Each structure stands twice: as structure tokens, then as C-alpha cells.
């Protein structure tokens, strides 16, 4: 599922998610295109988001844009789904 809102009190969304298994994929492209993720405040917001996701029981896989459709990413997602209860 694309653009999944995972937090009950914030408007945080994962790029892709399997909600029934609490497995998510985040595409980290900002470092390469000058996006907000490389600025200190953007980086800190991302840290808060990922920490809250962990507290809520989510396994978050972070990939670069070029890795999204790679076999190694698919294998990571499969392993996460198999191992994350």
C-alpha cells in the first residue's frame, strides 16, 4: 500500500506499507536531490518519525530511490514480513 498513514496522532505517512504485518518501506531520496531530509530540522523530524514508528511496533526499511525495485530490497521486505509478528 502506498502512502500509508501509520500514526494515530500525527500526519506521518510511510511511502509503502504492509499494515497487517507492520512493515514499511521509506525511500530516502532527499540526500541526493537537495531535499529537506539533509537539512538538520528535516533529519531530526525523520528521526522522530522513525522512533515513533518503532515504538508502535513497525519495522521500517529505508532504501535509496534506485534500490526500490531491486531484488535485494524485495528480499529484505520478504524477510521482514516473515520475521515481524
Predicted regions located by residue number:
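Nucleic-acid endo/exonuclease domains
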Residues: 1-85
